[in-house]
């Protein structure tokens, strides 16, 4: 199994949950974030004491964005031929098998990934332990 190319520490700056304005006051207003667009809205005008709006400052660092805790980025694989793309990038990307791939194709993908020294995130998913006879 390849080790990741660099294990920079993933820092989550501020994991604020952004709820919709007045979602705590009215049941009909869901908590899912919507940008306020009213002319008098105090959240849109960023008054002190009002809730924060999502902005670019809450984002992750560019070096660790989309990096999973094991140090790899994910790349979705649909067939055996797509593994060839990861041949030179096997220390940066890990393969994720697409959800609609059959068990027979999954087995072939996992075997080929082992030959190419590519990490597969869930190699045993949806594989039978014994074949039916």
Curated annotation (Swiss-Prot):
Keywords: Ribonucleoprotein, Ribosomal protein. GO terms for molecular function: structural constituent of ribosome. Pfam families: Ribosomal_L32e. GO terms for biological process: translation. GO terms for cellular component: cytosolic large ribosomal subunit. The keyword Ribosomal protein applies. The keyword DNA damage does not apply. Belongs to the eukaryotic ribosomal protein eL32 family. This is Large ribosomal subunit protein eL32. The gene is rpl32.
């Amino acid at each position: 199994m390849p080790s990741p190319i660099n294990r920079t520490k993933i820092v989550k700056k501020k994991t604020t949950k952004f709820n919709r304005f007045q979602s705590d006051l009215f049941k009909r207003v869901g908590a899912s974030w919507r940008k306020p667009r009213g002319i008098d809205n105090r959240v849109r005008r960023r008054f002190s004491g009002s809730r924060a709006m999502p902005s670019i400052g809450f984002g992750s660092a560019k070096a660790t964005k989309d990096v999973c805790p094991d140090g790899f980025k994910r790349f979705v694989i649909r067939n055996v031929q797509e593994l060839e793309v990861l041949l030179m990038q096997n220390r940066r990307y890990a393969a994720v098998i697409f959800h609609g791939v059959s068990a027979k194709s999954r087995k072939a993908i996992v075997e080929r990934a082992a030959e190419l020294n590519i990490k597969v995130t869930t190699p045993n998913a949806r594989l039978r332990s014994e074949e039916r006879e």
